[in-house]
């Protein structure tokens, strides 16, 4: 009885131990296979996604870069063309103006007008040249029409003269004698209470009459700065030249020293910044305006 019991227990123990060994080995193999499959699967998926993502990103960068460069190149090309075209237009215009000026100068040398030796019956009878002594370097053997565009400080006023047919014709007339008292560009911009010469004395209405009003206002402004037929109308008094502007207002001109002039239409004397003498008159540049709102 004891022997059979011992054998039974021994066999049972052996079976249990064998079963545990088998289960442990199977468990290890199962874990190893599962872990290997998981690692392999994870690595394959990540690698494919990474390659696909990287390739797509590189393609997008290349495509975007190409588009940007082409657009920039196109814009740069257009910009260069515009610069070249603008430069060509400017050069052609400058050449045309230069040729026109040269023609004007040659035409101005044909007939040099005589300067009156006497003034009016009023005041002293004196030579205009004795009263106005212009330095030789400021004397030009040409006409007002050709010298006006060369004075860069009065381009606005010169433009007004050019756009007035009657006055422009006089500046080109070698038999004319004129004095142009030209306001500088700065004075026209700063001394008219923020108005333009064509905006006063008559206000614009905003209708079809505006063209006429603009023309009349500019005419009024010009007539207040110009003396025509000067050599036949001036008088002298106390070393001053007195004459009437086209608008009828009296103006006085006096010289202080060899190159200093002043102009007055009332009690105030205005310094003359630049003086030029040509065959058919004088240009006096001032940093003020004689006609104000």
Curated annotation (Swiss-Prot):
Pfam family, one: Fasciclin
Chain spans, region Disordered: 76-126
Subcellular location: Vacuole
Residue ranges, compositional bias (Basic and acidic residues): 76-87
UniProt keyword terms in alphabetical order: Signal, Vacuole
FAS1 domain residues: 141-290
GO cellular component, one term: vacuole
PROSITE patterns: FAS1
Leader peptide range in chain numbering: 1-18
Name of protein: FAS1 domain-containing protein DEHA2G15708g
């Amino acid at each position: 009885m004891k022997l059979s019991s011992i054998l039974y227990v021994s066999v049972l123990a052996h079976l249990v131990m064998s079963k545990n060994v088998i289960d442990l080995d199977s468990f290890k193999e199962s874990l190893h296979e599962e872990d290997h499959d998981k690692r392999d699967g994870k690595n394959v998926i990540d690698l494919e996604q990474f390659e696909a993502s990287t390739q797509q990103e590189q393609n997008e960068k290349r495509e975007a870069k190409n588009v940007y460069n082409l657009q920039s190149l196109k814009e740069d090309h257009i910009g260069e063309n515009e610069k070249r075209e603008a430069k060509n237009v400017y050069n052609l215009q400058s050449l045309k103006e230069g040729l026109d000026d040269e023609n004007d100068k040659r035409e101005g040398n044909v007939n040099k007008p005589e300067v009156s030796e006497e003034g009016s019956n009023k005041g002293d009878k004196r030579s205009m040249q004795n009263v106005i002594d212009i330095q030789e370097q400021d004397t030009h053997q040409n006409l007002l029409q050709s010298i006006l565009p060369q004075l860069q400080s009065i381009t606005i006023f010169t433009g007004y003269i050019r756009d007035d047919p009657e006055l422009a014709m006089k500046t080109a007339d070698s038999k004319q004698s004129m004095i142009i008292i030209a306001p500088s560009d700065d004075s026209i911009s700063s001394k008219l209470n923020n108005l333009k010469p064509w905006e006063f004395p008559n206000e614009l209405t905003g209708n079809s009459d505006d063209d006429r009003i603009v023309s009349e206002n500019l005419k009024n402004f010009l007539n207040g700065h110009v003396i025509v037929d000067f050599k036949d109308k001036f008088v002298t008094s106390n070393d001053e030249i007195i004459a009437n502007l086209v608008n009828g207002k009296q103006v006085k001109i006096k010289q202080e020293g060899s190159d200093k002039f002043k102009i007055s239409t009332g009690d105030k004397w205005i310094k003359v910044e630049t003086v030029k003498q040509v065959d058919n008159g004088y240009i006096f540049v001032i940093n003020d305006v004689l006609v104000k709102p």
